[in-house]
Amino acid sequence: MTLNLCVLTPNRTVWDSEVKEIILSTNSGQIGVLKNHAPIATALDIGILKIRLTNQQWVTMALMGGFARIGNNEITILVNDAEKSIDIDPQEAQQTLKIAEANLNKAEGKRQTIEANLALRRARTRVETILESINRF
């Protein structure tokens, strides 16, 4: 028996297939989910989703915050945006990270600082997703 994982954004279905296990970033830390996990609904932080496929290989995905519902071996993840590591251009991600760091350094006022911090977290997560897929697998 396996888990059925569905990752949805407002615009598309990013993932919809069976998996062996996942590790995801919630607002209170990382959690691992195996088959027969206790039912839970949780808020998701900007972070990396690690997916172990039924063939034991791992895949990573950048999640940009949202919610997850787990129950009856079904995992539904609703997020603002998501990208599989293989779909992220490493050079573009690195450039976006540099721009986000520069924008944070020149941010003025509370609102600009908050927005720049959020952009930096998103950019950093995309780069870390690529690195995690390279280093782990």
Swiss-Prot record:
GO MF, any single term: ATP binding
UniProt KW keywords: ATP synthesis, CF(1), Chloroplast, Hydrogen ion transport, Ion transport, Membrane, Plastid, Thylakoid, Transport
GO cellular component: chloroplast thylakoid membrane; proton-transporting ATP synthase complex
Source superkingdom: Eukaryota
Primary localization class, coarse: plastid
Subcellular location: Plastid, Chloroplast thylakoid membrane
Quaternary structure note: F-type ATPases have 2 components, CF(1) - the catalytic core - and CF(0) - the membrane proton channel. CF(1) has five subunits: alpha(3), beta(3), gamma(1), delta(1), epsilon(1). CF(0) has three main subunits: a, b and c.
Function: Produces ATP from ADP in the presence of a proton gradient across the membrane.
Protein name: ATP synthase epsilon chain, chloroplastic
Species name: Medicago sativa
Name of the gene: atpE
